[in-house]
Regions:
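Basic, Lys/Arg-enriched alpha-helical interface segments
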Residues: 1-57, 65-70, 77-97
Length: 97
C-alpha cells in the first residue's frame, strides 16, 4: 500500500471545502487510489489529475513516486482547472528537486 502525503496547498484547499458530500467522495477516491485503483485519472507531464464527477467537477492533482508514495499536490474544480494545473506543476517541481 503506497504512502499518501499531502502538500500544504492540498491540505489548505481540502480544509476549506464546505461540501461534505464532496469531501466524502474525495476521501473514497484517494483510498481507492492507495489500493491501486486509480479510476478516472488523466496524466500530463508526470502529474495525475484525479477527476471526481460530482458537483462542479472536483480535481485532485498528484505525483506518483514508484509504488511507495503518492503526493497530493493541490485541488480544485473544473472552473479553476487551468490555474490548478499550473499550480500543480509548480508544486511538483519542488518535490522533484
Amino acid at each position: 500500500v503506497p504512502e499518501i502525503r499531502q502538500t500544504r496547498e492540498y491540505a489548505t484547499w481540502y480544509s476549506r471545502l464546505r461540501d461534505v458530500g464532496a469531501k466524502a467522495r474525495i476521501d473514497v477516491r484517494i483510498r481507492r487510489m492507495s489500493l491501486g485503483n486509480l479510476g478516472d485519472v488523466k496524466f500530463f507531464g508526470g502529474i495525475g489529475e484525479l477527476r471526481i464527477d460530482y458537483g462542479p467537477g472536483y480535481r485532485v492533482y498528484f505525483l506518483k513516486r514508484g509504488d511507495v508514495l503518492i503526493v497530493l499536490l493541490c485541488g480544485g474544480d473544473k472552473s479553476t482547472q487551468a490555474s490548478d494545473i499550473a499550480s500543480a506543476k509548480t508544486i511538483a517541481a519542488r518535490w522533484k528537486e
